[in-house]
C-alpha cells in the first residue's frame, strides 16, 4: 500500500516536471513565431521569384483576411491547366486574400514537439501540425480535442505552437 502511494507520488512529480518543461518549449515556439519567422507580402510570383518550385508544390503558412482560422497552412503549386501559381487548402483552391505568407521550412526542427514525447499541448493553443506525409495544417487544440478549420478531429505526428488561445494562464 505504501509502496503504491510512493510510486504514484513520484509518477505525478515526473509528469509535473515534463509538463513544465513542455510549457517552456511551447513558449519558445510562440516567441520564435512572433519574432523570428519572416513574413512576406506581395504577389505569389514575387514570393517565389527565382526559386524552383517542386512538382508537388511547397507548404506555406499565411495570415488570411477571413474570420475562421485566419492563420492557415496552404500549398503553393502551379495549376495543371495554365501553369499559373495558386494556393490550395487541401483539395480546394484558396481565394482569400492574404496579409503575409512564410514557408513551413522556416520553422526549425528543434522546436517542433513530437506527439510521441508530448502527447498534447499543456493548454489551449493554435498549432501548425505535421502529419508525417508532407501535409501541414493549422489546428486549434482545446479540451483534449484537435480541430481543423473544417472541424475534423485530427492527430498529428508533430506540432509547432503558434499561439496560446488562453492568454491569462
Protein language model features and the residues they cover:
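Structural boundary micro-motifs
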Residues: 2-169
Amino acid at each position: 500500500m505504501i509502496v503504491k502511494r510512493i510510486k504514484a507520488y513520484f509518477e505525478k512529480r515526473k509528469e509535473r516536471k515534463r509538463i513544465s518543461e513542455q510549457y517552456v518549449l511551447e513558449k519558445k515556439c510562440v516567441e520564435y513565431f512572433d519574432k523570428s519567422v519572416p513574413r512576406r507580402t506581395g504577389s505569389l510570383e514575387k514570393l517565389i521569384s527565382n526559386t524552383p518550385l517542386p512538382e508537388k508544390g511547397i507548404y506555406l503558412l499565411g495570415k488570411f483576411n477571413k474570420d475562421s482560422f485566419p492563420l492557415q497552412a496552404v500549398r503553393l503549386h502551379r495549376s495543371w491547366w495554365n501553369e499559373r501559381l495558386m494556393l490550395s487548402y487541401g483539395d480546394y483552391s484558396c481565394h482569400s486574400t492574404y496579409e503575409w505568407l512564410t514557408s513551413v521550412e522556416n520553422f526549425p526542427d528543434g522546436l517542433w514537439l513530437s506527439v510521441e514525447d508530448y502527447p498534447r499541448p499543456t493548454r489551449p493553443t493554435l498549432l501548425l501540425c505535421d502529419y508525417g506525409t508532407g501535409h501541414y495544417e493549422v489546428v486549434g487544440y482545446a479540451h483534449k480535442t484537435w480541430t481543423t478549420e473544417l472541424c475534423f478531429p485530427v492527430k498529428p505526428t508533430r506540432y509547432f505552437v503558434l499561439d496560446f488561445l488562453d492568454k491569462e494562464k
